[in-house]
Design a protein with these regions (language model features):
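C-terminal accessory subdomain/extension
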Residues: 113-237
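Active-site loop/helix belt of alpha/beta enzymes
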Residues: 1-107, 111-115, 181, 232
Length: 237
């Protein structure tokens, strides 16, 4: 506390806030409360030395859902802003419940009819077992879509789940749309929604939040209020 107080008194420096971050707020209540108590003790020690902070905060999404006593001056919801729970055990703690609000969509760029035996994408990891219609979707690992989902994941076109065929490329991937009548260039391909994101995270051995954060800057963001884009120049697919 003495060292922090000394730093706060440096000329030209105004210490405005004090914060910590819970290590296991979606797990152990005892550990989280012990961490919170240590934080409060540190704040009190600084106040005894004449250092007061305008804003003190520590409540992450898991704490927001469970521990109102940790709210202090503000809270830091992250994952819950996307409509996701930090842990399965926390579902139902917020009354009506959260619903995923983020989706990633693209459009089919081209559709090709290919004969049985045709290899698809880099490395020829997929060889068509029947005459097929293959759709090209301009989404790849350059957009944050995991290459590890090659030959494993699906996207949704015209309401039907279509498997990824071959390796995910930097800027595109290929879907088998043989069983979806009428697919054509311009059709919307749902890359992620709630169920698809959860499935993709499970296959990739990670959590949905990592995949959401991985969506690269080159992917346009469309923010909607009551179903309407807040930017008239960007419209949702």
């Amino acid at each position: 506390a003495d060292e922090i107080a000394r730093l706060c008194r440096l000329p030209g420096l105004e210490a405005e806030g004090l914060f910590t971050h819970f290590a296991d707020a979606d797990g152990s209540e005892a550990y989280t409360m012990a961490q919170f108590d240590r934080f409060l003790a540190a704040r009190a020690a600084l106040e005894e030395r004449g250092i007061a902070f305008k804003i003190c905060h520590c409540a992450s999404s898991a704490a927001v859902l469970q521990y109102p006593c940790t709210y202090l001056d503000m809270v830091r919801p992250g994952l819950v802003l996307y409509g996701w729970y930090p842990a399965e055990e926390l579902k139902g703690l917020d009354g009506p419940g959260l619903e995923p609000v983020m989706a990633v969509k693209s459009r089919v760029a081209a559709v090709r009819s290919l004969p049985k035996g045709t290899p698809v994408s880099y490395g020829r990891t997929a060889v068509l077992e029947r005459d097929s219609r293959i759709a090209v979707v301009p989404v790849g690992y350059g957009d944050g879509y995991p290459r590890s989902l090659s030959n494993r994941m699906v996207m949704r076109v015209r309401g039907v789940e279509c498997p990824i065929v071959g390796r995910v490329c930097m800027d595109m991937c290929m879907l088998d749309v043989t069983d979806v009548p009428g697919v054509q260039a311009g059709d919307v391909a749902v890359v992620y929604d709630g169920p698809l994101l959860e499935r993709a995270a499970r296959l990739a051995g990670t959590i949905p939040y990592e995949l959401m954060c991985a969506v690269s800057k080159r992917v346009p963001r469309v923010y909607r209020l009551n179903g309407v884009s807040v930017d008239k120049n960007l419209q949702p697919l």
